[in-house]
Amino acid sequence: MKFERARPFIAIVFIQCLYALMSIVAKLALNKGMSPHVLVAYRMAVASALITPFALILERNTRPKLTFKILLQIAILSLFEPVVEQNLYYSGMKLTTATFTSALCNALPAMTFIMACVFKLEKVTIERRHSQAKLVGTMVAIGGAMLMTFVKGNVIELPWTSNSRGLNGHTHAMRIPKQADIARGSIMLVASCFSWSCYIILQAKILAQYKAELSLTALMCIMGMLEATVMGLIWERKNMSVWKINPDVTLLASIYGGLVSGLAYYVIGWASKERGPVFVSAFNPLSMVLVAILSTFVFLEKVYVGRVIGSVVIVIGIYLVLWGKSKDKGGMLQPNAGCAETVVKIDQQKVPTPDNNQVVSISYHLMIPKAAARSQE
């Protein structure tokens, strides 16, 4: 019985460890000269090959009819994620560091909350304490992101960061990003979070009409692969040699990224059904901490006081938002629970749907996740 209760904790901690390692591997590949656009295309190719067979087999009897309208919506969905989001994410990571990227993207729940308010998927009542917590948490998380971007502070000295080489054996791992690169990278990372938030909103609307999550993910990966390939060919048209993959960390990043994406879909989806999306979201900062620790060894990355404080502020903001979401009326409904109407929950947001037989619960983690993840992917 105790193990049954502990399984969701073990599973999510395991996934966060995989996310952290994915951030490190991706950064190694980018440092080696791999194009972010090529990495996205190859990662989606692996994810498509992994997920499609399961979708064809497991949902062969339950998959609804695919209309042209739904297909067009999925094509737009795949533009937001993975094409735009992941290209911006990896481009931002290339200009900054793995730790900075992981920490800044922790502000995603706050940005999702803002987008949900814009699209009227989130109800805010100023008089309610939980609504106040969500608003304050959003502002705190954004403030932490700004603090990370513009305030560096003193270096926190660590004995092993004074070595001449990182664990990857290359002195270029010690390259310290310029402030201009940090600013440009931050803009790209924030834009990637915005794209992910748009993806969440559209995903919920599509799932209300096409209730086959696995098939939707497979279609999104296939279309994303095609769109990312076209984008990569256009972007790298003057240097087609970047598409060549050698049996080194660039190949590892492509395969590992795709495998983690596919595995995370199942594990996070299962954990969301077992304990709810707020439970899953609460573990996001773990990946950031693991990336920060690994980066000091692998990249000899310097740890700055300002970045640490900014990361802590972001985490505080996240938990304020998540606490507020957990207190929303009906916020803890579980899938397949009896309910008078069907709702689609986006990390605790509710969207009425035409059918009134069941409850579909998803969170922004449910589909393919960034290094991180991004936590998330």
Curated annotation (Swiss-Prot):
It is found in: Membrane. The chain crosses the membrane at residues 9-29, 38-58, 64-84, 99-119, 136-156, 187-207, 214-234, 251-271, 279-299, 303-323. Keywords: Membrane, Repeat, Transmembrane, Transmembrane helix. It is a multi-pass membrane protein. One of its GO terms (cellular component) is membrane. GO terms for molecular function: transmembrane transporter activity. Its main location: membrane. Residues 18-149, 194-322 form the EamA domain. InterPro entries: EamA_dom, WAT1-related. Belongs to the drug/metabolite transporter (DMT) superfamily. Plant drug/metabolite exporter (P-DME) (TC 2.A.7.4) family. PANTHER family: WAT1-RELATED PROTEIN. This is WAT1-related protein At5g13670. It comes from Arabidopsis thaliana.
